[in-house]
């Protein structure tokens, strides 16, 4: 008889706080630190903790699998949940820097600022190597970038993907007006952050 394949429907994990934390104690973290596996180009330390605060992305860029993998609704862990992971692992592994690998770390300013309040107390440098959407919160972008910098963010990656508006509009469906890129770069630099695009 022919084989039958059943593909179950995808389900999103709605409450990220219910997910177990990464079991870093089971991994040879010293080996990763030694080879610089978690570093961005301008890392302040080779002892980097990679963290994800959220899942999902409302954008529909043709090259990206995030909406298919995590869904289009952005779901955040609570600051308390993030704090528990970071506090424990910073101490356990003598961490010198935190890198947030979220696809849309800046989409929700309330959650971002709550995270910044906590990170300011931690006192470690941090960055966003995966990229942040350039045109979120344009009217309050200066305030947002300054808050990030004040809490220890030394480098922001702006996800431009292309310097050609036709490519952005017609090939990769990246909803981005290139006219917003240079002002965003200037705002981030004025806040004291390095900028990667």
Predicted feature residues:
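Glycine-rich beta-alpha loop elements in corrinoid/cobalamin-binding modules
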Residues: 1-20
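Radical SAM [4Fe-4S] cluster-binding motif and immediate context
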Residues: 24-196
């Amino acid at each position: 008889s022919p084989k039958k394949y059943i593909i179950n429907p995808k389900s999103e994990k709605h409450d990220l706080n219910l997910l177990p934390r990464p079991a870093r104690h089971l991994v040879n973290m010293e080996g990763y630190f030694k080879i610089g596996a978690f570093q961005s180009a301008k890392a302040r330390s080779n002892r980097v903790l990679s963290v994800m605060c959220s899942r999902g992305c409302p954008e529909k860029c043709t090259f990206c699998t995030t909406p298919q993998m995590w869904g289009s609704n952005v779901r955040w862990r609570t600051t308390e949940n993030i704090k528990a992971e970071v506090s424990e692992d910073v101490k356990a592994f003598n961490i010198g820097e935190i890198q947030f690998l979220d696809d849309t770390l800046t989409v929700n300013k309330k959650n971002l600022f709550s995270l910044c309040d906590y990170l300011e107390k931690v006192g470690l440098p941090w960055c966003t190597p995966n990229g942040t959407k350039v045109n979120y919160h344009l009217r309050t972008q200066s305030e947002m970038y300054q808050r990030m910098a004040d809490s220890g963010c030394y480098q922001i990656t702006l996800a431009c993907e292309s310097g050609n508006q036709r490519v952005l509009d017609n090939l990769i469906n990246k909803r981005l007006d290139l006219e917003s890129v240079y002002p965003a770069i200037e705002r981030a630099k004025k806040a004291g952050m390095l900028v990667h695009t």
